[in-house]
Amino acid sequence: MALSPEPSSRFLVPATMGSAMPELPGAPNASLNSSLASPTEPNSLEDLVATGTIGVVLSAMGVVGMAGNVYTLTVMCRFLHTSASMYVYVINLALADLLYLLSIPFIVATYVTKRWHFGDVGCRVLFSLDFLTMHASIFTLTLMSRERYAAVVRPLDTVQRSKGYRKVLALGTWLLALLLALPMMLAIRLVRRGHKSLCLPAWGQRTHRAYLTLLFGTSIVGPGVVIGLLYVRLARAYWLSQRSSFTQTRRLPNPRVLYLILGIVLLFWACFLPFWLWQLLAQYRGAPPLAPRSARIVNYLTTCLTYGNSCVNPFLYTLLTKNYRDYRQRSLHSRGTSGPVGVRSFPQGHTRCQLGSGRSVTSSSQQATETIALSQAVPGSLCV
């Protein structure tokens, strides 16, 4: 999140390649410290151009991203009365993006003035905010992928889950993200180094390296493995449904919804993986053999990529929810009129599924449209 001439984008890193002061690797925003020790003269033309360019780019991203996420939150709040999980999760994602983008003015102000103006509290809040929002986003995306998977292979379980259950899960993502960000919030502190103020963690470099490695696992590796497995199994379910000779019509979820969720996940990885590799390279291999100017450019690019993710996401959220609403409306319409082969229509507002064991489940149409009656995935079930 912060800017630095060293190989660090948002985390505190050991000062290298011309930095005037030693710094521990640290938290999101940490490169704000390094920006106070630019490898170019503070008033040089190169420094002014770099400062102006990055300030304009980040400010533009902030304005576009904040407007988009506020719009998304406004629209999604209108649908909170429904039982659809998608709306709860999109609100979670937009809120995380908005909180992350709100840090841009602090970064730009610090980089332009070469001074830290926000005290010890500012250090603790801004340096831990990245970890919090990063994890809240990827945990929510993992929940969304799990929900879509369950809608295909366990549709009746999905029907029976209430809106309150999904809100608890959404809240749980924030609590878990806060737990992971808490060590940085407690360890970071404002330190005077000569005439400058720096935000530095109180622990040593080994501890910090272990902490960053843990966060890389919880924000990239772990969720990546889970989401990858879910989509492999979803692809297998689709493949089996296409090859099946079963004559009863099966209602599969809108592939566009699944593709858009996967697209949001891939965008997250594309924007954050370079940043993480840049950080971990500095932790485990030391300063890369780059000139100060080159390291500064890489730092700018990785920083802009992470903010670019939150800037572009609202457009994907809009497409996602539009396709999801269209799918729900088509599902409700088809069930209320003719109904698919082998499925008997019921009065508007209810569907009834009979299990092979003789048990039955009745649910509201709002919840029913959330699920997929995939006979191949749920042996022994038949919608009547």
Swiss-Prot record:
Segments on the Extracellular face: 1-54, 114-124, 187-209, 286-299
PANTHER family with a match to the protein in the record: G-PROTEIN COUPLED RECEPTOR (PTHR24230), UROTENSIN-2 RECEPTOR (PTHR24230:SF60)
Cytoplasmic side stretches: 78-87, 147-167, 233-259, 321-384
Keywords: Cell membrane, Disulfide bond, G-protein coupled receptor, Glycoprotein, Membrane, Receptor, Transducer, Transmembrane, Transmembrane helix
GO molecular function, one term: urotensin II receptor activity
S-S pairs: 123-199
Primary localisation category: membrane
InterPro entries, sorted: GPCR_Rhodpsn, GPCR_Rhodpsn_7TM, Urot_II_rcpt
SUPFAM superfamilies (alphabetical): Family A G protein-coupled receptor-like (SSF81321)
Protein name: Urotensin-2 receptor
Function: High affinity receptor for urotensin-2 and urotensin-2B. The activity of this receptor is mediated by a G-protein that activate a phosphatidylinositol-calcium second messenger system.
GO biological process: blood vessel diameter maintenance; neuropeptide signaling pathway; regulation of blood pressure
Family the UniProt entry places it in: Belongs to the G-protein coupled receptor 1 family.
Glycosylation site list: 29, 33
Tissue: Expressed in neural tissue, including sensory epithelia.
Subcellular localization(s) per the UniProt record: Cell membrane
Mode of membrane association: Multi-pass membrane protein
Pfam families: 7tm_1 (PF00001)
GO cellular component: plasma membrane
Organism of provenance: Bos taurus
